[in-house]
Amino acid sequence: MRTGRMSRKTKETDIQLELNLDGTGIADVNTGIGFFDHMLTSFARHAEFDLKVRAEGDLYVDEHHLVEDTGIVLGKVLAEALGDMAGTARFGEARIPMDEALADVALDIGGRSYLVLKAEFASPQVGQFSTQLVKHFFETLASNAKITIHASVYGDNDHHKIEALFKAFAYAMKRAVKIEGKEVKSTKGTL
């Protein structure tokens, strides 16, 4: 099974995370930030990954450290679960609507970190979640998982736009990690 787990404790956060790429979409997430929990749960459900997250942090400061460190840990665990990536499809893409919002995500899990995100948010927050952290979360995740993500979203409702992004990311990841043979998808023979 393609799984990973990690515990990371700093002076700002304490995070335990488990991931199973060959799961059924079971999520058990508690970060103390309701909207972020909703996004991570949605990601797991739609990617059909099993995800368990326990995260505590200095939320009395703000949610930045907790969201950032969750991105670090999820990225590292994702890289661990992918292993040498032999047989994986490597590339994934998805286009997901949510009412008036439409998100597009294309990604490559081939070991190169990069993020391009085209998104604008009208509100500074959705619930207790700063909309500035959408880009930062995906940057941190991409860097630590060593994946390239191109994403864009438009719409009127910030909740819908962010949720459409997380769902599009989920479906793109689901396609990228799918086993399609035994070889590494690279002309180099390795990633």
Curated annotation (Swiss-Prot):
Subcellular localization: Cytoplasm
Enzyme class: lyase
A Pfam family hit: IGPD
UniProt keyword annotation of Cytoplasm present: yes
GO molecular function: imidazoleglycerol-phosphate dehydratase activity
Keywords: Amino-acid biosynthesis, Cytoplasm, Histidine biosynthesis, Lyase
Enzyme Commission number(s): 4.2.1.19
KW Magnesium (keyword) present: no
Recorded metabolic or biological pathway in which this protein acts: Amino-acid biosynthesis; L-histidine biosynthesis; L-histidine from 5-phospho-alpha-D-ribose 1-diphosphate: step 6/9
Catalysis performed (reactions): D-erythro-1-(imidazol-4-yl)glycerol 3-phosphate = 3-(imidazol-4-yl)-2-oxopropyl phosphate + H2O
GO biological process terms on file: L-histidine biosynthetic process
Gene Ontology cellular component annotations, sorted alphabetically: cytoplasm
HAMAP family for the chain: HisB
Similarity comment: Belongs to the imidazoleglycerol-phosphate dehydratase family.
Protein name: Imidazoleglycerol-phosphate dehydratase
Protein species of origin: Methanosarcina barkeri (strain Fusaro / DSM 804)
Gene that produces this protein: hisB
